[in-house]
Amino acid sequence: LPHSYSKERETATMSSLDIEKIRRDFPILRREIDGKRLVYLDNAATSQKPLSMINCLNEYYQRYNANVHRGIHTLSEEATALYEGTRETVRRFIGARESCEIIFTRGTTEAINLVAYSWGRQNVLPGDEIVLSPMEHHSNLVPWQVLAQEREAKLVFLDLTEDGEINMETAAELIGPRTKLLAITQMSNVLGTITPVQELARLAHKQGAVVLVDGAQGVPHLETSVQSMEVDFLAFSMHKMLGPTGVGVLWGKKEILNAMPPFMYGGDMISSVARERSRYNELPWKFEAGTPNIADVIASGQAIDYLNALGMETVREHEVEITRYALSRLKELKGITIYGPKDATKRGGVVSFNMPDIHPHDLGQILSDAGIAIRAGHHCCQPLMKDLKVMGTARASFYIYNTFVEVDMLMAALREADKVMGNVACR
């Protein structure tokens, strides 16, 4: 481990999280890469998994494996109780009013597509406007592009400040009487910017518009209440918040969901079927056709329990501190470009940067050789990259198990990359 620390490290304080205890809960963090300790800084792509969640998956298949909602035998009843129990766990976690407002999907992408298909095709008319930010992940852009083309609607993009925050002055002008939908990220996966969702939602609702929030980056890191945000839809994924892959959540207001037609058709989403027509099930099951991802949904509940035990305020406190420290260390590199808000309290634990004359992919490979996992590329945000006038960035992203020491290890590797590439001189 590096032994030379900056003055910022000497004065930095860790949050109340017991990071070493937390790290012991994550088996993969004990792995070495080519003899080097794994430093996992790609949490915006997916988080690592605690042993309690992994054990929950194993226990399900060893003790409870059965289909849900359809059997009267003990295994099916127990599996159904666990599955629906997770729905209630999710409801409490995001402050929803009723568990029937929680729809399980395959991920954030499917959740947003569900709204675009089921709500959008019913409600968006020619001449309507769909308002987005320039920071949107392709998953919260491409579905609206397709819908706008089909319905002859128009996409409108909010402005950003030089610091990568939403320009609220022009937002009040761009969200207007033609706005039918505001689809906005809770937190940028490139800039780390935390969006003022409630303020934007109020502007949209004054115009009679509906508000959808892409919470893929926000929900795992911020205390989230759909009531406080005052939105109509929230989409997020469990794999970014300690859960397994293949599980997403769509929350929507009950009255809006009730008015929407199903997204997919088949078993379990019906109440009765005749030869000529069918009657659809009630919420939430009318949006959950077929056998669901039972085991992973149940294990997702265990992941939420883990976060609840830590406390989301404490999770946020830790990320602010480690992000502030990372920003201060990265600034030591002469010529480095760091994207997004300078104030760590206005951003999440996502830090994108570029070093002069070093391609992000080359940098990512050099860091990988040092056992450090980051992301390099456009991060599924090509329009934003065009606005930033770059092809891509390097991105380090932090979570509950990352430490100041790992930031120092990142810095040591970046300095080594500087030497290897012969480009950047440190101050």
Listing of model-derived features with the role each one plays in the protein:
Residues 3-427:
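Pyridoxal 5′-phosphate
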